[in-house]
Amino acid sequence: MNPRQAEVERNTLETQIRVTLNLDGSGQADLHTGLPFLDHMIHQIVRHGLFDMHIQAQGDLDIDAHHTVEDIGIALGQAFARAVGDKAGIQRYGHAYVPLDEALSRVVVDLSGRPGLIFAVEFPRAQVGDFDVDLFHEFFQGFVNHAQVTLHLDTLRGSNTHHIAETLFKACGRALRMAVAPDPRMAGAVPSTKGTLTL
């Protein structure tokens, strides 16, 4: 299989973002989003997905974190789509349940070529530190729209907002790792009766 790597730059009047992604990495992260809690969460995707990822971001954080969080999701989605390519010879589907103490989340993904986000998550608190956890929806929406995947995120239980968020991101990493994994029995074929997952 060819190297599954990508680099994306996204520059607007609101944000300047560079993302590099290697799907066949070892869980190495170099994350500089300007938002420490977001770095911590994306690190969970990297470590549990066994991806290598670098993110350098500058945004209008003096106004709000919204643009930065959403645009990082967009750039990461673009990098993911480029790295995974035509999806020939991969599993396509992935799922994971991840607990952390009292919290339990389930993530299911289909590299379908059709963007769709189901975000069935309730956070008991609006913030962790000074990070607005409502922005996680914007992060995943940006990712889904540009990765062209269907993603279901469900929190099954939990009372600690940090724990809930961490289980979501860990499960997302593990589900994506499963979905992009090579399937030798596919013999390089695209896992769809349509013969394509890019149209």
UniProtKB/Swiss-Prot annotation:
PROSITE patterns: IGP_DEHYDRATASE_1, IGP_DEHYDRATASE_2. The keyword Repeat does not apply. It comes from the Bacteria. Gene3D superfamilies: Imidazole glycerol phosphate dehydratase, domain 1. It is found in: Cytoplasm. One of its GO terms (molecular function) is imidazoleglycerol-phosphate dehydratase activity. One of its GO terms (biological process) is L-histidine biosynthetic process. Pathway: Amino-acid biosynthesis; L-histidine biosynthesis; L-histidine from 5-phospho-alpha-D-ribose 1-diphosphate: step 6/9. It catalyses: D-erythro-1-(imidazol-4-yl)glycerol 3-phosphate = 3-(imidazol-4-yl)-2-oxopropyl phosphate + H2O. InterPro entries: IGPD_sf (IPR038494), ImidazoleglycerolP_deHydtase (IPR000807), ImidazoleglycerP_deHydtase_CS (IPR020565), Ribosomal_Su5_D2-typ_SF (IPR020568). Pfam families: IGPD. CDD domains: IGPD. One of its GO terms (cellular component) is cytoplasm. Keywords: Amino-acid biosynthesis, Cytoplasm, Histidine biosynthesis, Lyase. Its EC number is 4.2.1.19. PANTHER family: IMIDAZOLEGLYCEROL-PHOSPHATE DEHYDRATASE, IMIDAZOLEGLYCEROL-PHOSPHATE DEHYDRATASE HIS7. Belongs to the imidazoleglycerol-phosphate dehydratase family. This is Imidazoleglycerol-phosphate dehydratase. It comes from Acidithiobacillus ferrooxidans (strain ATCC 23270 / DSM 14882 / CIP 104768 / NCIMB 8455). The gene is hisB.
